[in-house]
Structure formats: structure tokens, C-alpha cells
Amino acid sequence: MSEQFDASRPIYAQLVERLKAKILAGTYPPGGHLDSVRDLAAAAGVNPNTMQRALAQLEAEGLVRTERTDGRFVT
């Protein structure tokens, strides 16, 4: 199911907020493995490049870490 987005703000920024809220709420627990970029993008109804940008921002903020062969994990 696609999410609804506010057209006045960048979609990637809204994704960052939503993913951050899920991390802080425990939906994605520390050490938990995140779904693939494609799966997360499909669930949100966005382009994978947009989701990649959101995940890169979360990584820059220290909330997510990327393991080259294993994917992304919540820190």
C-alpha cells in the first residue's frame, strides 16, 4: 500500500521522518535488519532512488548502518 506524501516537501525527507519514527518506536529494533531498498520503496510507493536517498540520510545521522553484503541494520 502506497503512503501519502505532502507535495510541498521533498519525499525523501518525509521518508526519513517516517523511518526515524518507526526506529524510535521500536518497529525496527536496534540490530534489526531492514528490508531491501526495493521492498521498502515498493511498500511506500516511491522510486527506489528516493528510498536510497532517505536511507543514506539515516545512515549519515547514525540511525542505520550498511554492511556491504548483508544489507542495512538499525544501530
Locate predicted features.
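N-terminal helix-turn-helix
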Residues: 33-66
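Minor-groove-contacting beta-hairpin "wing" of winged helix-turn-helix DNA-binding domains
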Residues: 36, 70-75
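Extreme N-terminal segment that seeds HTH/winged-HTH DNA-binding domains in transcriptional regulators
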Residues: 1-34, 39-43
